[in-house]
């Protein structure tokens, strides 16, 4: 009997597909049934080969060998996943396999993962495509009933291939040119370099910012606060103190007369459903999670727990075909603290509107929402619970009625000067009930105060009990944190010099720099290359990063290049542009980049050289700040030796409660805090042991749980081991 080979992107998804398709016979790297054989990749199993596979001379990095423009680019099997590739290849080439179903992630990159494996395996069999947004049993069954012909995704594959090949030509040539020219480990790319430039420009804005003092006038009448307003501009700031003093003198001792009382009924709908970037922003703002951390948690909630839909989405809308499933989804997540809100939604027919249902605003995947699978909240760890909470509350909130209130504005005159007071009376909490008054989570950013305004009428006189001058200062832009950097990457129009409206529109339509799936990795790459560093929660460029921006060609620093690429890649995916035409342009562009770097008169200087010599090549080493602490790195790029000298731990300073760094080696290890506090590791362990003896069962259990969850080694191994052996008896 002929069979169908199903190729998933990851083992966890493959096992789910196998179970639903009744495949029970477990093989090495695959699961087989009567009709289907399910196997899987491990992400990419195949990639574009390094330059040396075209010519041995490319093993050495030399400026004179550039540009490298081999054609066609060859595929190679990734070494660490070669075993799984051979398993997949063998299954694909079985004589009883008549067709292949691509069941990798439904998107450009998922298409590339599968097509490269098929191409490298030299398989010529009919292809079908599974295109689903969640991996619940129901979604998988529906998806297999509606498999699409593989030829319908040929242009998507061409677009993915064009992107990968263009990144190879431009990225490898530019990186080698910079590295060879300046003998430093320098790298650039069409996404990471503009992102670095955006951070640098924000720093320049802050540096050049000159604060201005402004003044205002505040009048109080029987507890009512009235704010001065310019008659012409409606602004309440005065930048000229003499003008403010003059107004103040002219109205001192005078009462106010009400000239207008305006009441307006207002309603406000909940913020839209989450896409990945918005979720990463909120998780960073509320919990301090990095974008990569949030994506990793989301991936578990999608793949392992099957509670949320596909995470790598750039849409905040659902399609009309999802509407019929909403009741089931509300029932599935409506447990525990969500039961009250869910019950209220389910009492009546569910109402939808254009604020979250729009077919035109969904391309590959709809917004992140709960699946129809019931949740056991206790099965989630603390971090999973927090991310799940954000998604569920946002989902329930959009299904709730709007927040309704009456906005009231009192306008009064004191002599010839206008004063206003604003307030609101809540009519119905609506969707805000879901958040129980937690305004940090609901993200509503209310601009109308809750000041209770008195009942006054036009013509009434208000007795002014006090009138005073207020003073403030304009503030510079905030430095980027990971959340605000994601926003800038998503919408980088502000940083584009081009006046070309088409390009501005393209960068907006294509989601800015990078994709929802790659932005977290781009930020991590900038940390890993020591081009940016973290101070507190804020991100800053390093000296190396700033110098790199002085060295790279201007084109590579602007989001405009990405906009142009995405415009063409979009045309390829729609069948309007040939892939080879785009690649030829990229080869020409690579030549230009290399020539510009070769002819540059700029110099690169290591300004972080230490007195420590490299144990491998004896050259002086550089001190760099990585995301996890300080490192010593050999300045010679060909040597590549690196050593950690301190790392940021979870240990909190007893004085200021901030995370401390662990420095030194062996018995000389010492905790150091920015506030100046220092403590030897040995005395820290003793102190913690004493605290543990006094701790409650709950505290100790929590400590052990946190240690087990930590990705890095626990900062206090001896203590963690001792705690894990404790027999914690229940309190009577």
Question: Model features per residue range: what roles?
Answer:
Residues 1-3, 103-106, 183-185, 263-272, ...:
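Conserved short loop/turn motifs at secondary-structure junctions
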Residues 238-272, 280, 560:
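Metal- or metallocofactor-binding catalytic centers and their adjacent structured scaffolds
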Residues 1-164, 476:
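Intrinsically disordered, low-complexity regulatory segments
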Residues 73, 115, 139-221, 264:
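C-terminal or mid-to-C-terminal helical accessory/interaction module adjacent to the motor/catalytic core
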Residues 2-5, 27, 81, 92, ...:
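Basic, low-complexity terminal or inter-domain segments flanking catalytic cores
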Residues 305-306, 530:
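Glycine-centered, phosphate/nucleic-acid-interacting loop/turn motifs that mediate DNA/RNA or nucleotide
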Residues 28-58, 193-239, 399-451:
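Structured, non-catalytic alpha/beta "coupling" segments that mediate domain-domain communication
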């Amino acid at each position: 009997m002929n069979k169908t080979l199903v190729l998933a992107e990851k083992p966890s998804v493959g096992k789910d597909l196998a179970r639903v398709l009744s495949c029970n016979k477990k093989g090495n790297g695959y699961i087989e049934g009567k009709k289907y054989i399910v196997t899987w990749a491990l992400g990419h199993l195949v990639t574009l080969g390094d330059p040396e596979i075209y010519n041995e001379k490319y093993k050495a990095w030399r400026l004179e060998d550039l540009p490298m423009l081999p054609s066609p680019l060859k595929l190679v099997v990734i070494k660490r996943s070669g075993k799984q590739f051979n398993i997949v290849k063998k299954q694909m080439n079985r004589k009883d396999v008549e067709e292949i179903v691509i069941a990798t992630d439904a998107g450009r990159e998922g298409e590339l993962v599968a097509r490269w494996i098929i191409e490298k395996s030299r398989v010529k069999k009919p292809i079908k495509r599974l295109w689903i947004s969640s991996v619940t049993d129901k979604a998988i069954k529906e998806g297999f009933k509606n498999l699409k012909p593989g030829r319908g995704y040929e242009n998507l594959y061409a677009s993915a291939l064009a992107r990968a090949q263009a990144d190879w030509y431009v990225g490898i040539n530019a990186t080698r040119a910079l590295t060879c020219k300046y003998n430093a480990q320098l790298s650039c790319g069409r996404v990471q370099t503009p992102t670095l430039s955006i951070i640098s420009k924000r720093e320049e804005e802050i540096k050049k910012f000159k604060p201005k003092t402004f003044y205002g006038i505040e009048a109080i009448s029987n507890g009512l606060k009235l704010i001065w307003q310019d008659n012409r501009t409606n602004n309440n700031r005065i930048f000229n103190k003499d003008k403010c003093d003059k107004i103040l003198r002219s109205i001192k001792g005078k009462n106010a007369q009400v000239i207008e009382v305006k009441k307006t009924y207002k309603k406000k709908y909940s913020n839209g459903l989450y896409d990945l970037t918005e979720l990463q922003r909120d998780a960073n703002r509320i919990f301090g999670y990095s974008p990569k951390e949030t994506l990793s948690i989301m991936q578990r909630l999608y793949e392992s727990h099957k509670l949320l839909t596909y995470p790598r989405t750039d849409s905040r809308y659902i399609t009309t075909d999802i509407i019929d499933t909403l009741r089931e989804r509300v029932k599935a997540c409506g447990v525990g603290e969500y039961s009250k809100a869910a019950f209220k939604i389910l009492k009546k027919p569910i109402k939808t509107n254009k604020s979250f249902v729009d077919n035109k605003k969904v391309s590959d995947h709809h917004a992140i929402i709960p699946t129809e699978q019931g949740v056991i909240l206790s099965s989630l760890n603390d971090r999973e619970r927090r991310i799940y909470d954000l998604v569920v509350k946002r989902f329930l909130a959009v299904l709730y009625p709007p927040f309704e209130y009456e906005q009231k504005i009192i306008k009064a005159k004191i002599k010839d000067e206008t004063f206003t007071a604003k307030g609101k009376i809540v009519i119905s909490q609506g969707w805000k009930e879901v958040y129980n008054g937690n305004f940090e989570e609901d993200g509503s950013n209310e601009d109308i105060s809750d000041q209770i305004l008195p009942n006054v009428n036009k013509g009434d006189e208000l007795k002014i009990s006090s009138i005073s001058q207020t003073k403030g200062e304009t503030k510079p832009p905030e430095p980027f944190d990971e959340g605000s950097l994601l926003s800038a990457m998503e919408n980088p129009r502000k940083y584009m010099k081009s006046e070309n409206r088409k390009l501005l529109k393209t960068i907006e339509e294509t989601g800015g720099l990078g994709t929802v799936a790659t932005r977290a990795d781009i930020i991590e790459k900038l940390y890993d290359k020591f081009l940016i560093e973290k101070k507190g929660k804020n991100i800053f460029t390093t000296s190396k990063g700033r110098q790199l921006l002085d060295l790279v060609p201007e084109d590579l620093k602007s989001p405009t290049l990405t906009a142009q690429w995405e415009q063409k890649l979009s045309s390829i995916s729609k069948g309007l542009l040939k892939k080879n035409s785009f690649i030829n342009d990229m080869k020409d562009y690579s030549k230009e980049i290399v020539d510009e770097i070769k002819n540059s008169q700029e110099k690169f200087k290591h300004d972080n050289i230490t007195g420590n010599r490299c144990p491998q090549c004896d050259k002086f080493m550089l001190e760099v700040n990585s995301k996890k602490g300080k490192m010593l790195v050999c300045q010679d790029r060909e040597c590549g030796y690196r050593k950690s000298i301190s790392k940021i731990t979870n240990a909190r300073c007893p004085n200021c409660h901030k995370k401390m760094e662990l420095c030194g080696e062996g018995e000389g290890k010492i905790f150091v805090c920015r506030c100046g506090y220092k403590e030897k590791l040995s005395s820290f362990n003793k102190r913690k042991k004493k605290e543990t003896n006094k701790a409650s069962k709950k505290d100790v259990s929590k400590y052990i749980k946190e240690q087990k969850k930590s990705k890095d080694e626990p900062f206090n191994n001896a203590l963690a081991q001792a705690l894990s052996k404790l027999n914690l008896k229940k309190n009577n």
